[in-house]
Amino acid sequence: MEKALKIDTPQQGSIQDINHRVWVLQDQTLIAVPRKDRMSPVTIALISCRHVETLEKDRGNPIYLGLNGLNLCLMCAKVGDQPTLQLKEKDIMDLYNQPEPVKSFLFYHSQSGRNSTFESVAFPGWFIAVSSEGGCPLILTQELGKANTTDFGLTMLF
């Protein structure tokens, strides 16, 4: 089997939901707020997992998601009976260079037209979401297209 080319740096992008809310970092928590002047949305760092052969096929591109320049990465962990989305201090390149996938930090990125979804690899069927209210922390949900928004626009920066 052919080895994938090694990547030195993650790609960068910005994310907003269908209501034009962007992700911002507030007290070590990611929240979605309406885009305004003089606001600084986070720049997302993302990089594909090098070990796709060990993951489910046809679910999307397995990626690590972090905050560019901040050594913070998104991860999923069970708190009580519920999977939760958390920010953990971690260098995204350290995750990328691990000898095996670090599933708690991986998301299946699926694209349909301009919309992207991010499904937890550790908790299949759970997706990154924002409350339709806005101004709330990002969460994980199993309920697509209901009270929470799971479709995002991902714009890659070059």
From Swiss-Prot:
Keyword Translocase: no
Residue ranges the record assigns to the propeptide: 1-5
InterPro entries: IL-1_fam, IL1/FGF
A Gene Ontology cellular-component term: cytoplasm
Post-translational modification: N-terminal truncation leads to a dramatic enhancement of its activity (>1000-fold).
Regulation: induction: By Il-1 and TNF-alpha.
rRNA-binding found in the keyword field: no
Gene Ontology BP term (one): inflammatory response
Keyword annotations of the record: Cytokine, Cytoplasm, Immunity, Inflammatory response, Innate immunity, Nitration, Secreted
Tissue-level expression: Expressed in immune system and fetal brain, but not in other tissues tested or in multiple hematopoietic cell lines. Predominantly expressed in skin keratinocytes but not in fibroblasts, endothelial cells or melanocytes. Increased in lesional psoriasis skin.
Subcellular location: Cytoplasm; Secreted
GO molecular function terms attached to this record: cytokine activity; interleukin-1 receptor binding
Alphabetical list of Pfam families matching this protein: IL1
Sequence positions bearing 3'-nitrotyrosine: Y96
Additional remarks: Initial experiments using non-processed full-length protein found in vitro activity only in the ug range.
Oligomeric form and interacting partners: Interacts with TMED10; the interaction mediates the translocation from the cytoplasm into the ERGIC (endoplasmic reticulum-Golgi intermediate compartment) and thereby secretion.
Role of this protein: Cytokine that binds to and signals through the IL1RL2/IL-36R receptor which in turn activates NF-kappa-B and MAPK signaling pathways in target cells linked to a pro-inflammatory response. Part of the IL-36 signaling system that is thought to be present in epithelial barriers and to take part in local inflammatory response; similar to the IL-1 system with which it shares the coreceptor IL1RAP. Seems to be involved in skin inflammatory response by acting on keratinocytes, dendritic cells and indirectly on T-cells to drive tissue infiltration, cell maturation and cell proliferation.
Family, as annotated: Belongs to the IL-1 family.
Designated name of the protein: Interleukin-36 alpha
